[in-house]
Curated annotation (Swiss-Prot):
Compartmental location: Cytoplasm
Species of the source: Symbiobacterium thermophilum (strain DSM 24528 / JCM 14929 / IAM 14863 / T)
Keyword tags: Cytoplasm, DNA damage, DNA excision, DNA repair, Excision nuclease, SOS response
Keyword DNA damage: yes
A GO biological process held by the record: SOS response
Protein name: UvrABC system protein C
């Protein structure tokens, strides 16, 4: 179906649209109040489109759409789809999956504060994400010092109390005669309020409890509460007062650097600045400031439990009313989303914007220093190996096996001296499992055959674009990661592996690529052009870079080999039966207890297992053997 036909079928309804390229990859996800009108705007006139959007439009061959009931639902769906597919042309938070959270386990009998790598719908209260693990651990340490909750995984292991109990940092729910249930519940509530920045509320509650304890002549308990109050006051006294009212708000501003945007968030709780965080967003070139902030708010607040009553931004947002409606639904009460133009709040926004600019300036300076150092190393390597061009892209191959079993190869890629993990590839050997030289030749051959095929597809795609008159600026992109050939190829091994790799490269017509073998034993290099071994100076940055690349290839191959080994060790003959997946396999083994018992059972007995039809039972018996009746 052509694009015009796909456009004609779009509904006049809210929802999300997904643009796909010739390979079926999703390259952009968007939302719309009216799908038909919004998507048609991309194809009606190129006059108002940026170069980046023109390039994207030139690659679209398929349009998929998902209808929603409301625009707010479309906004939530868009955020989830971007997170799942990571489309090339969407602006998105960088590396958000690595940011840790603090998790308050409210569903446990005795809740505790633990570190979590992701947020789940498990009834717990999550705080974060923390872009700095150091800040997260400092918060954890502080929380454990101020609020005496348990830190152990299993309270039943310490019937006499753990060390934290004996030093006064845990109320001791593990004790058989524990009777401080109310105090523990209060500590949980206070910790949650403290982590949400409601410090004044916590202090007021603690002071009230201290007075009540004194009235009941519970002087030891009153003293504990007094010490806790003093500790919290000492922690919070350095927090800067930036609002004269007891307000909770997040203040968000951004600064640009190349195709990135640095978004700074100041967290104000009860009028005090309790923290700030810096986030990086990729794909920000040609995006307006409002679009950057809108994308950040969608992605950031979809990953956090807490939404403040008010959010201040440095620029007006597109679809601000829809975003505010979504935030309000998430919070459970109205959220004000504002771009202040004057007064105290405008000054606050400008302060955050200044901090964002300073952070990105520092990042630019750091990047320039790193680039200068990296270019120096690459020039050093170019000189040592007499390369015709700077080795910006370096690829390295390694073969891994254990006694000839499960032989695998890895290909790692470094660009500009840094790993480019999106281009890493792994190969499971198909030909000669017991020949290291042949294995290396197979891996290198498969890499370049695929690369040549992708380059041919690129040419065909551009010719087709020219014929159809839909060439975007720069031309459409076709093919995959293999189409980029290296400036330098490293083979993990000696002259034998190198010789086999070069033979297959000559056969494919890619032998112009400089190729070297790197021997592990003495860190010497070999190449076809020189009879003697090449020794780079010990301690040189060029040698260190090659060692790092070689070690990364070895690590990547070993990781894949272990994965295959684990899979093989848990594989059973049931896995080879069509129609038997993990759930049915589990049901069969739970019912019969072993493969032997299944083999000895009749077809009718196997068919009695939930989810197993008579036809499936016959397949199972054919695969395992044993009596059919």
């Amino acid at each position: 179906m052509g694009l015009e036909e796909q456009l004609r079928l779009l509904p006049d309804r809210p929802g999300c649209y997904l643009f796909k390229d010739a390979s079926g990859r999703i390259i952009y996800v968007g939302k719309a109040r009216n799908l038909k009108n919004r998507v048609r705007q991309y194809f009606q006139s190129s006059r108002n489109l940026t170069a980046k959007v023109l390039a994207m439009v030139g690659q679209i061959v398929e349009i998929e759409h998902i209808v929603t009931d409301t625009e707010t639902e479309a906004l939530v769906l868009e955020s989830n789809l971007i997170k799942k597919h990571k489309p090339k042309y969407n602006i998105r938070l960088r590396d958000d999956k690595h940011y840790p959270y603090l998790r308050l386990t409210l569903t446990e009998q005795w809740p505790r504060l633990v570190v979590a790598r992701s947020m789940k719908k498990d009834g717990s209260r999550y705080f974060g994400p923390y872009t700095s693990s150091q800040a997260m651990w400092e918060t954890m340490k502080l929380a454990r010092r101020l609020f005496p909750l348990r830190t152990c995984n299993d309270p039943s292991r310490y019937p006499r109390g753990c060390l934290q109990y004996h030093i006064g940092r845990c109320l001791g729910p593990c004790l058989p005669d524990f009777d401080r249930h109310r105090e523990y519940a209060e500590a949980v509530r206070d910790l949650q309020a403290f982590l949400e920045g409601r410090t004044q509320e916590v202090l007021e509650r603690l002071r009230a409890r201290m007075e009540q304890a004194a009235e009941r002549l519970e002087f030891e308990r009153a003293a504990e509460l007094r010490d806790q109050i003093r500790a919290i006051e000492k922690v919070t006294e350095k927090q800067k007062i930036i609002a004269h009212t007891m307000v909770d708000l997040d203040v968000i501003a951004y600064a640009r650097l190349y195709d990135e945007a640095g978004v700074q968030v100041f967290f104000v709780r009860q009028g005090k600045l309790v923290g700030r965080d810096q986030f990086l967003m990729s794909g920000a070139d040609e995006m307006t400031g409002g679009e950057i902030l809108a994308a950040f708010i969608q992605q950031h607040y979809s990953q956090t439990d807490f939404v403040p009553k008010e959010i201040l931004v440095s620029e007006d947002l597109p679809d601000a009313d829809v975003i505010a409606e979504w935030l309000s639904a998430k919070r459970g009460s109205r959220v004000a989303l504002r771009c202040p133009k004057r007064g105290e709040k405008r000054a606050l926004v400008e302060m955050v914007a200044q901090n964002a600019q300073e952070a990105m300036t520092e990042r630019r300076q750091q990047r320039e220093l790193e680039l200068a150092a990296t270019e120096g190393v690459l020039r050093e390597l170019q000189a040592y190996l007499d390369l015709p061009r700077l080795p910006h892209r370096i690829e390295c191959f390694d073969v891994s096996h254990v006694q000839g079993a499960e032989v695998v190869a890895s290909m790692v890629v470094f660009e500009g001296g840094r790993p480019k993990k999106s281009d890493y590839r792994r190969f499971k050997m198909k030909v000669d499992q017991n020949n290291d030289f042949a294995n290396m030749a197979e891996a290198v051959g498969r890499r370049f055959r695929r690369g040549l095929a992708e380059r041919a597809a690129q040419v065909e795609g551009r010719v087709r674009d020219l014929e159809e008159g839909r060439v975007a600026e720069g031309g459409a992109e076709y093919g995959g990661k293999f189409a980029d050939f290296p400036d330098l190829l490293i083979i993990d091994g000696g002259k034998g592996q190198l010789s086999y790799a070069r033979a297959v490269m000559r056969e494919l017509g890619v032998d112009h690529i400089p190729t070297f073998g790197l021997a592990k034993e003495n860190e010497l290099l070999c190449t076809e052009d020189r009879p003697d071994w090449i020794e780079l100076p010990r301690g040189s940055q060029a040698l260190f870079l090659l060692q790092r690349i070689r070690d990364e290839a070895h690590r990547f191959a070993i990781t894949y080999h272990r994965k295959l080994h684990r899979r093989a060790s848990t594989h059973s003959r049931l896995d080879d039966v069509p129609g038997i997946g993990p759930k049915r396999k589990k049901a069969l083994l739970q019912h019969f207890g072993s493969l032997k018992a299944i083999r000895e059972a009749s077809v009718e007995e196997v068919a009695q297992v939930p989810g197993i039809t008579l036809e499936l039972a016959e397949r199972v018996k054919e695969a395992l053997g044993g009596p059919m009746r």
